[in-house]
Amino acid sequence: MAIPGRQYGLILPKKAQQLHPVLQKPSVFGNDSDDDDDETSVSESLQREAAKKQAMKQTKLEIQKALAEDSTVYEYDSIYDEMQKKKEESNPKLLLGKDRKPKYIHNLLKAVEIRKKEQEKRMEKKIQREREMEKGEFDDKEAFVTSAYKKKLQERAEEEERERRAAALEARLDVTKQRDLSGFYRHLLNQAVGEEEVPTCSFREARSEIKEEKSKGYSDEVSSESRIPPENCIRQTGVKVEENPDADSDFDAKSSENDEMEGDKGNCRREKGTETLSSHSKHHRNPARSPSSSEEREHGTQCHTKSSRSRGHEKREDEHQERPAREQDSYHTDRDSRKEKRDSHRHRESSHRDSHWKRHEEERLRGRDERERNDREWKREKDREKYPSREQERHRQRNNYDRHNEKGCEKEEKSKEKEEHVKARKERYENSDKYRDREKREVSVESSERNRDRKESSPNSRAKDRFVNQERASKMRDMEKDKERNPEKPSSSEASLGAKHRITEECQETGKEQERLHETVNKFAKRSNEETVTSARDRYLARQMARINAKTYIEKEDD
């Protein structure tokens, strides 16, 4: 069943009933007169007026209802203006554009003023020089000075005085221009005497001090009316610092806002504690200035010893004076400890950051090296797969090259060992005392061999050997004569350069003779004698040494 009151299908809106009835057009063939037309037009205008009045009443009623609910319904302009103001306040760019001040123009204006003053000074100097050049030509004339010029001169004098004071103050305040600690001690002395105001302490510490005094129940307790409120204390410290800017110039400057707040607190605390100090110092200073200082001192000691109550009062005063100093020391130590903690924390953070960054860099480099290594291996494998024969050939060439290098290194090592061995043998023979005896023995052995070979050789070779023997005998005679002349000098490493040169020449000659003998003598002749064998080895070493000494250049040793 269909639910009653519910429609289904296409729902079309019903046309609203027309307020004004539709007037039928008069027919063309009707008998309507002009009077009927007038009546219809009047009725239509009346109906329209009535509809307008009804709509006006309705709108007035609605306006009254809306105003009763909210009085600011129709204040469009004011609400829009407020919205625009809020937008402008929330937008910092617009605020910066409005309140923006010139950045550089004031500095430029100052520079212009300074240049003007310098120009005026230059002109005055120029006029002064011209007057000096005139040499009193116009001294009898009257000099007229205007009031404006007098005013300018006065302003210039005042400005010069200001500059001089500013320079002196800067020199006093500048730490780099201080020659000694006289300024620091001067401030301390003035503060102790009372000529300068001591920097005030903080209100918080003053309040804690008042609480401690209340708990102890001192008789000289400060009344609530005489207590300094924090705003007045802060104002007072600001005024005092402005009046005496040099009073606290040698102390440390606070680097952060917290330290500045703590400094203000310490100043307020110091003011309260040192008021009693200044009064006490004045009390002790005044009797010293008076003529009857000794009598007053005696009177003071009598008054001091009159009653135990006054003694207790003075003790409390001393404690009260010492307490600010102790608290000030504790404040400074706390501040230093806080600074150290802050610095250590910063250092720890920076070291942790550096270590983290280093670790990250190492991991990145390691990863990059691994990637490059993997890429190289992958390329190598691809090349092997593509060109296996080429890879084998390259491997074979590399092995041959390595083997050749190893052989070359072995040869170089052997040649070096030989040279070292030759040098060692030469030094040993030069240092030994039996060097010349052994040479004589070698010469005798060689002569015996030569005689033996001469029998076998041809007559031409015999003539040559005879000539060589004569030369050898003459040289031996010369050597014996030298030995007889210098019998005390042994043949050691300290022999003269001439003797060394002679020995090298003999070695060269012996080498030449050996070559000649080898040409003549049969190479395959047996030598069973041990002396002949040792002499041959010695001859070989002598030949090597002769070659080394004959070289005019130094061979480069291969690495």
UniProtKB/Swiss-Prot annotation:
Q: How does this polypeptide assemble, per the annotation?
A: Interacts (via C-terminus) with SRSF1. Interacts (via C-terminus) with SRSF2.
Indicate, by first and last residue, each region the UniProt record lists as having compositional bias (Basic and acidic residues): 204-219, 251-274, 314-343, 351-488, 502-521
What gene is this protein translated from? NSRP1
Can you name the source organism?
Bos taurus (Bovine)
Task: Identify its protein family.
Answer: Belongs to the NSRP1 family.
Q: Name one process (GO BP) from the record.
A: mRNA processing
Name this protein carries in UniProt: Nuclear speckle splicing regulatory protein 1
Task: List UniProt keywords, sorted A-Z.
Answer: Coiled coil, Isopeptide bond, mRNA processing, mRNA splicing, Nucleus, Phosphoprotein, RNA-binding, Ubl conjugation
Q: Where is the composition biased (Acidic residues)?
A: 32-41
Q: What is the lineage of its organism?
A: Eukaryota, Metazoa, Chordata, Craniata, Vertebrata
* Disulfide bond entries: none
